Amino acid sequence: MNGIDDLLNINDRIKQVQNERNELASKLQNLKQSLASNDTEVALSEVIAQDIIEVGASVEGLEQLRAKYGDLQILNKLEKVAVQQTQMQAGVDKLDSFERQLDELAEQPPDQFTLDDVKALHSKLTSVFATVPQINNIDSQYAAYNKLKSKVTGKYNDVIIQRLATNWSNTFDQKLLEAQWDTQKFASTSVGLVKCLRENSTKLYQLSLLYLPLEEETQNGDSERPLSRSNNNQEPVLWNFKSLANNFNVRFTYHFHATSSSSKIETYFQFLNDYLAENLYKCINIFHDDCNGLTKPVIHEQFINYVLQPIRDKVRSTLFQNDLKTLIVLISQILATDKNLLNSFHYHGLGLVSLISDEVWEKWINYEVEMANRQFINITKNPEDFPKSSQNFVKLINKIYDYLEPFYDLDFDLLVRYKLMTCSLIFMNLTSSYLDYILTVDSLNETRTKEQELYQTMAKLQHVNFVYRKIKSLSSNFIFIQLTDIVNSTESKKYNSLFQNVENDYEKAMSTDMQNSIVHRIQKLLKETLRNYFKISTWSTLEMSVDENIGPSSVPSAELVNSINVLRRLINKLDSMDIPLAISLKVKNELLNVIVNYFTESILKLNKFNQNGLNQFLHDFKSLSSILSLPSHATNYKCMSLHELVKILKLKYDPNNQQFLNPEYIKTGNFTSLKEAYSIKYLKDTKIQDALYRIIYGNIL
């Protein structure tokens, strides 16, 4: 007790303690009940587990437990496992029985079997497989079943399929050779013979479809294939097509086996082409059997596929040779043959190009790059060949592209890398090298003239433009559009073309470097011819009336005639060149600016003029500038400003507007009214002010 208040509240405190004691007692009671319940559940679980051990191994025992304990989840799971084990054991028993049957059948001669017998065996075996469930957790029982399944399947394929296929196909091979079905001697009108051959083909085809793939074959991809599997893909051997291709195989071996060392590679592929051209559609017509799956498209594809086999073998053996020349010829023939198979025979199966390894592709690419560079050097090494360099270069590009086109036409994902390599190492590299060559080549001798140097620059521009158009055409070919899309997709780029950077370099060379060089060279030549014209000092004393416009009544100053002739010759040469119109117009526009500058700075500002002098000045300017033949609708700011400047200077001779010559008016610098009166649009106010001062200071007489 701490005080009187605690003493007064003693009853409340006693009640609180009693409540806490009751609550604690309740919790203790609940805990005792929970522990007792847990003990009961544990005891029950132990009882159930013991019952499962004793009777839960069978479906019947599990049903008894379900009746006793209810629908427990563990019982459902155990029942599922029991059912699977029962089915699996039944499958094992059936496979054991089937294996014994196969052992018995192995003793029977092949001629005692019919196709229906094989179909029945196939159906029986596949039905056994279907009754055994697929499970994720592989236990020892399932592993044993799978082992037995593979053993029985392999024995079925060997004892039944392989043995019968070999026997029946040997017989069919002989019939086909005797019938000479792939020669002109074949009597296609013999209905009985055609029917017999077709039935034999169909029987072998149906037998091929009864082959059962082993589990590891479907999982391991390119692992070792059994004899009854095709050696060029993962499909089972179609024995009828192997027989149909046997005649070609015999002929091919006869012609090329003994003389393989002396036969040109090209003859192998020509022999193939001739054989298919003669016999493909004959084979389709004779052996198609739509009712049994041998449709015309199937025969079309598979006949070519099997006829290709000896060619594949020949290609493989040749690819192992170390002779680079032979290798290059072989690849060229492979590319051409695959393209021909696609375009001429509409074959979409696995072509010969699939036989070429990465190592061989690398050798081929390196060789083609080396040859392309060597040919490029040949057409650019002699400066005297400069005049025809662009034509020779484009011929080289066309030749290389035509050679590579069969390679580009092959739709084979693994070839994308090599297609990109040819684009980069050959086409992009060569076009860049040609631009470097053009920018540095000098075909002139030491006694050159400035005009010859100008013409060489014009010729360079023409060559670059010619090749530039070829690059644009090349980049629009489907293969390069396709490769651009691939690069953009894989590298997250937005190239318009793989040649984009090369095109930009060509455009810069033309529109900046060469264009400016041409303007500069013409400017220097023109300035040289204008020396005497700049010395004229009689502009203020001319007495003969002159029409400022070009016409028969007026002639340019004698000192300007040579400049006119030279500029005309240079512009005619420029117009004769095959260069972009935009660049030609820019060159002429820049030359017009040069002419305006010469006439303004070297003549108009440095001399006094009378009215005839101004007219002669303007006539001379028009005579020289008109040679440029710029479009009439084209507006040149400097040219228009010069015309307006002369118009202002002629105000001296306009008695109706002398108020514009008032010094106070001129001093204001505000010439709005004057501009309206004389339709001045381009000349700046400062230039107008200078012109008006020239008038009142006596420079215009």
Curated annotation (Swiss-Prot):
Compartment list: Endoplasmic reticulum membrane
Signal peptide from the UniProt entry: none
A biological process term (GO) from this entry: regulation of ER to Golgi vesicle-mediated transport
Matching Pfam families: RINT1_TIP1
InterPro entries: EXOC6PINT-1/Sec15/Tip20_C_dom2, RINT1_Tip20, Tip20p_domA, Tip20p_domB, Tip20p_domC, Tip20p_domE
Keywords: Endoplasmic reticulum, ER-Golgi transport, Membrane, Protein transport, Transport
Membrane topology value: Peripheral membrane protein
Main location: endoplasmic reticulum
Gene3D superfamilies linked: Dsl1p vesicle tethering complex, Tip20p subunit, domain A, Dsl1p vesicle tethering complex, Tip20p subunit, domain B, Dsl1p vesicle tethering complex, Tip20p subunit, domain C, Dsl1p vesicle tethering complex, Tip20p subunit, domain D, Dsl1p vesicle tethering complex, Tip20p subunit, domain E
RINT1/TIP20 domain residues: 147-701
Superkingdom, taxonomy of origin: Eukaryota
One annotated Gene Ontology cellular component of this protein: cytosol
Subunit structure: Component of a peripheral membrane protein complex consisting of DSL1, SEC39/DSL3 and TIP20. Bound to a SNARE complex consisting of UFE1, USE1, SEC20 and SEC22 or YKT6 through direct interaction of TIP20 with SEC20. Interacts with DSL1, SEC39/DSL3 and the cytoplasmic domain of SEC20.
Function: Required for protein transport between the Golgi and the endoplasmic reticulum. May contribute to tethering of coatomer-coated retrograde transport vesicles to the ER membrane through interaction with and stabilization of the SNARE complex.
Additional record remark: Present with 6020 molecules/cell in log phase SD medium.
Annotated protein name in UniProt: Protein transport protein TIP20
Organism: Saccharomyces cerevisiae (strain ATCC 204508 / S288c)
